[in-house]
Amino acid sequence: LLDQPGQDAWLHVVGTTLTDGGGGGTDRERDIDRLVEAARKVLEGGEPATAGRSGHETVEAEIVVQAAEVVCRLADRYPRDPALLLVPMLQRLVLQPGEAMFVGPGVLHAYLGGMALEVMTPCDNVVRGGFTSKHVDTRALVDLLDTGNIPGVQRPVEGVHCYEVPVEDFAVWRIEGRHTLQVRT
């Protein structure tokens, strides 16, 4: 199903992962336990990760280790969150200082750590899929999910730089220089 995930496949996976289908969540809880157990095993060295591998296999193994680290970290904070089951399917990006990305509406994402500036248009439509104590609206998430919009990373440019955003609602400028800049309002 996920070898070539299209819009319908992703919507199905997200929808069925985040809802219990009326079964009381027993199967989902078992799946979460299995995922966390497997992730811990990878991190403890019980499953081969990068040893004895080279090239493409090593890169894939490193991705598995990174996903296992994220699963374990999130499972410690949100032990029964169904969104844990989605972690291995998500792309992990690490932004360096000055880098930016535009995450459009409907793109499933999570901030795992660090400092970031998030700019949104004025709205009241944040839809959460998990990893929160706030309300999770799975139906709205599935209805709004956009799986075709993969954001690209914009690299920093010295001096004055306006980050590219495909909307007219706002702009984000980065100003770097040797002098102090005072802004009066």
Q: Predicted segments — roles?
A:
Residues H109, N125, H179-L181:
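Residues that cap or initiate secondary-structure elements
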Residues G114-C162:
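C-terminal, non-catalytic macromolecule-binding modules
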Residues Q154-R184:
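A short glycine-rich, His/Asp/Glu-containing loop-to-beta-strand
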Residues Q66-P97:
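Conserved AWS/pre-SET-to-SET junction and N-terminal core of the SET lysine methyltransferase domain
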Residues L1-L74:
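Long, charge-rich alpha-helical interaction segments
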Residues A9, R80-D81, D137:
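Short, solvent-exposed helix-helix connector turns and helix-capping sites enriched
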Residues V94-G113:
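Conserved metal-binding segment of the jelly-roll/cupin
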Residues M101, L117, W173:
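A broad, low-specificity signal marking well-ordered, structured residues that form hydrophobic/aromatic
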